[in-house]
A protein has these predicted regions:
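Short beta-strand-plus-loop segments that form exposed binding edges in beta-rich domains
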Residues: 702-710, 731-745
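Acidic, His- and aromatic-enriched active-site or binding-groove loops in soluble protein domains
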Residues: 296-312, 316, 343-363, 450-458
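Acidic, contiguous N-terminal accessory segments
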Residues: 6, 16-89, 130, 134-146
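Structured mid-domain segments that build the active-site/substrate or prosthetic-cofactor binding neighborhood
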Residues: 247-253, 261, 368-482, 493
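Noncatalytic modules at the cell exterior or secretory-pathway interfaces
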Residues: 692-703, 722-729
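Catalytic domains of carbohydrate-active enzymes that cleave complex glycans
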Residues: 449-672, 678-680, 685, 752-754
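Substrate-binding cleft/loops of secretory-pathway carbohydrate-active enzymes
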Residues: 327-358, 405-412, 438-446
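Feature activates predominantly on carbohydrate-active enzymes
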Residues: 35-38, 42, 80-274, 280-308, ...
């Protein structure tokens, strides 16, 4: 046995002596061990041979990479104690030794990733792609000395959780790109501590926490829930409904008690967290009690009521935990900056100003510069007014939640992040960037966000080129970069808020646009050299082709079946990286149904022979907007064989339909047909809504519940304003005893067609 051990030791020394060495302290921390593992993994591929990891004092061969708190580093005057948790240092001692040092738990890891990026051009562009140029030499400049720390203290880009079997890859991808906050993903990402990940926000979670604070309340706390417009305090079912009564002293007491419990529980687990989030539920409800509404008048904003509530909590907790900072959100109606109130020094205001695709107070054009674009003048004022009152955290939106595919964020990203950092002095940033599969250049958007959150002074254009070369290949990159600029230029030509524009209403998305864009993609695919590069390009082709199909429905493509097949194949190739299995199955099912609908022979319109029909909307354009209540049903007498239907109501509640314009409610209309005047044949009939003026966000609805809805924004024209004035006709069928005397059918209202017709000359 003794001879075997001696032989093994000799082999180890020979192996170490035959190659460059990564040197760890004699007793390395977990972060130092991980940093060495990362170096060995990537450098081995870059230089084409193993790079061994040894402990300090073990025989090895120069050049040496000294990782962490080594005696060698200490001998050069570099003490680990001097570093902040995310601070890092690269310092060469000639060409034979390099010190990679930093703080715990992440600084030393950041030093290793900085070295890999700066000296070997190694990148992590998405969760499954690692870009490592091969055939390199392990070398550096003899006078190399770099140090730094992240620009934003808390950094998070939220893309959405993937399947559990992908969570490890996701954790590593985020950590390598120096994100330190994963929202609620922190609780399901396995053992992330080896990558330096710790909780950045304390319990209970990282968003919409009111519900967590109230979950244990009993009937005796009824007065602490928000009061509705009927004068009743109601317990919310979840965070999507209801709020709290913030003027009630008992609510303050309960929140203070719960916060203390959270702090104590976190510290018992070793999590000494600085920031705790106390934020409203995810809705725009306000407590209607007299005291809360009086506070709203006093502060000229619902935000003032919330700040007054949070101030009391901060004041109570400060006595025992003066270092704790409370983050609260200026959300929905609370987004208006208050007057006549000072904000406690330990309170930070989070600013989630949502895009104009949402109704209400939301006006922001999230794809444009806050500081420079005229569409964001109002929101810039809101941001700066809050920043005058308190330190601010940014909750940003890098995605449109409607028709997001062909709106690029590239131009606005660097402008906005630098505005938040330099002008608003924010050091906390969370960005929602969902739906990367259906977003043009989604991986680039996320990766560039990583770069600027980490280093606000990064050369943005150079970083863009670097990503393009790594992700699409140096030969295809020029075409993909030109495609990005082409789409950006087209976006810039639209004066309307992109969040309010439907796909059909976008004036920049012409058939010529798609033809030119396809040219860039075709040339890029021809230039790409590897299957991986082609796969990445085909993901962007999917976004273009799918939006082309949805807008023009193959009118510009003679080979319909081949085009539709290409879309599906590109989706199936790339979707597993970005979407859950159930989401993929749902998309494929809906896509196939949509393609079937495009091939359906629609019944001709009758009764409008002397009118000019501007738009004829049938299935599959008619689709569910309130899926729980509305169904797409097969129906032989429907114009396209399918229709939207609402049923499951047991009595007559009105034969009502209307037109709603969120941008100009005075433009809205509603009509009700008296029950006695309803046709009794249970067939489709046309009903006129009268003349309307189309806008980017307008829609029609059917039934007093509004559960049947259809957007007319697709029909809005930014270039032919005269076509926005039209008369709307709905083809509706009323069935069942609620509408037809003596009927044996179920009660149902069905919409199969919407006609927009040129108004008659007066």
């Amino acid at each position: 046995m003794k001879k075997t051990l001696i032989l093994a030791a000799a082999l180890l020394l020979f192996s170490a002596a035959d190659a460059e060495s990564i040197v760890l302290p004699a007793n390395p921390t977990e972060s130092e061990r991980t940093a060495a593992e990362e170096l060995a993994l990537h450098l081995g591929k870059a230089v084409g041979k193993p790079v061994p990891v040894i402990r300090e004092g073990t025989r090895g061969t120069a050049p040496f990479l000294y990782v962490g708190a080594t005696e060698f580093a200490r001998g050069k005057g570099i003490s680990a104690k001097r570093f902040e948790p995310e601070e890092w240092l690269l310092q060469a001692c000639g060409k034979e030794a390099l010190i990679l040092a930093g703080g715990e738990p992440r600084g030393v890891l950041y030093a290793s990733w900085e070295f890999l990026e700066r000296c070997f051009n190694i990148l992590w562009p998405d969760e499954e792609t690692v870009y490592i140029p091969e055939n390199q030499k392990l070398q550096w400049k003899g006078d190399l000395k770099l140090n730094g720390k992240p620009s934003f203290e808390i950094r998070c880009i939220f893309v959405l959780l993937k399947e559990l079997d992908r969570r490890d890859a996701r954790r590593v991808y985020l950590a390598r790109n120096r994100m330190n906050h994963f929202l609620d993903e922190e609780h399901v990402l396995g053992n992330s501590r080896k990558y330096g990940i710790r909780r950045m926000l304390g319990s209970p979670r990282s968003v919409h926490t009111f519900m967590d604070y109230m979950k244990d309340w009993g009937p005796e706390q009824l007065q602490c829930y928000s009061m509705n417009k009927e004068g009743k305090h109601v317990r919310p079912l979840n965070h999507l409904h209801g709020q709290i009564c913030m003027s009630n002293p008992e609510t303050v007491r309960l929140f203070v008690k719960k916060l203390r419990e959270y702090i104590a529980a976190d510290r018992a687990k070793g999590d000494f967290v600085k920031y705790y989030l106390i934020s409203s539920n995810d809705n725009s409800d306000e407590c209607q009690c007299p005291a809360c509404q009086d506070g709203k008048k006093k502060y000229a904003s619902w935000g003032g009521v919330q700040i007054s509530f949070i101030n009391k909590i901060a004041e109570a907790v400060e006595k025992d935990y003066p270092e704790i900072k409370i983050i609260t959100n200026a959300y929905h109606t609370a987004s208006i900056p208050p007057k006549n109130i000072r904000i406690h020094k330990n309170v930070i205001v989070d600013l989630p100003l949502m895009g104009a695709e949402f109704e209400g107070l939301q006006t922001r054009d999230t794809m444009r510069s806050v500081k420079r674009h005229p569409n964001n003048r109002r929101d810039r004022g809101v941001y700066e007014a809050w920043a005058e009152l308190a330190p601010v955290a940014m909750w940003d939106y890098w995605i449109l939640y409607k028709n997001n595919g062909l709106a690029v964020y590239h131009k606005a990203m660097s402008d906005n992040l630098r505005y938040y950092y330099h002008d608003l002095h924010s050091r906390i940033i969370v960005a929602e960037c969902e739906y990367p599969m259906t977003t043009m250049f989604g991986p680039l958007r996320v990766w560039l966000g990583f770069r600027l959150m980490y280093n606000i002074d990064e050369d943005f254009d150079a970083a863009t080129r670097r990503f393009m070369n790594a992700y699409y290949g140096t030969k295809a990159a020029p075409e993909m970069l030109a495609l990005l600029q082409f789409i950006q230029n087209c976006n810039d030509g639209v004066s309307y808020n992109l969040g309010t524009m439907s796909l059909g209403g976008r004036p920049d998305l012409t058939q010529d646009f798609f033809k030119k864009a396809d040219g860039y993609i075709t040339r890029a695919l021809a230039a790409a050299e590897t299957p991986e590069q082609k796969k990445h390009i085909r993901k962007e082709r999917f976004v273009l082709d799918y939006n082309n199909l949805c807008k023009f429905r193959n009118r510009a493509n003679p080979d319909m079946k081949a085009f539709q097949k290409r879309i599906l194949e590109d989706y199936q190739l790339n979707a597993p990286l970005y979407e859950r299995k159930k989401e993929i199955e749902k998309f494929i099912s809906g896509y196939r149904d949509f393609c079937l609908g495009l091939a359906v022979k629609v019944k001709p319109v009758r009764g409008f022979e002397n009118r000019k029909i501007l738009h004829d909307l049938t299935w599959p354009v008619l689709k569910q907007r309130v899926p729980a209540k509305t169904k797409v049903v097969d129906m032989n007498d429907a114009a396209a064989g399918k229709a939207l239907q609402i049923k499951d109501f047991d009595k007559y509640s009105g034969f009502t339909f209307g037109f709603f314009d969120p941008m100009n409610k005075k433009n809205s209309k509603v009509k009700t047909v008296p029950r006695a005047q309803l046709p009794q044949d249970e067939r489709f009939h046309y009903y006129s809504l009268g003349e309307v003026e189309l806008s980017p966000q307008c829609y029609i609805y059917v039934h007093p519940s509004w559960h049947i809805q259809q957007s007319l924004g697709e029909c809005f024209s930014a270039t032919l304003q005269e076509d926005n004035r039209c008369e709307v006709f709905l083809s509706l069928k009323a069935e069942g005893p609620a509408y037809v005397q003596g009927s044996k059918k179920e009660n149902a209202l069905t919409l199969d067609r919407v006609l927009l017709v040129k108004p008659l000359k007066k």
